[in-house]
Amino acid sequence: MKTEESESIVMMTLIAKREEKDNLLSALSESEIHLSNVSYGRGFVRTGYVKFSFGMSRDVRTVIIFCVSTDTKINKFLDRLLTEFNFDKPHTGIAYTIPINSISY
């Protein structure tokens, strides 16, 4: 049951250049975001329109990081992506969140 003091839980997906993996994982750990899963990918997009829209290159080897934490910690980390990792610039990465209302197992 969610109380007024409890925080929302969100899942963040982070896609970036593979060479940034260690720096991103260190930053996540420093931000106390510990529940993460790392996967490798290749390229961001296949169509010219989406490539142009997001400024991504097809030939980049990527790292995909999935994290689950509180919305407060994730929002602070998203700000850190802008200031330290320049995610507001083209060809750096994409990060987005999805709220998690409940988890069943």
Task: Say what each PLM segment does.
Residues 1-105:
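Positively charged, small/polar-rich N-terminal and surface patches that mediate targeting and assembly
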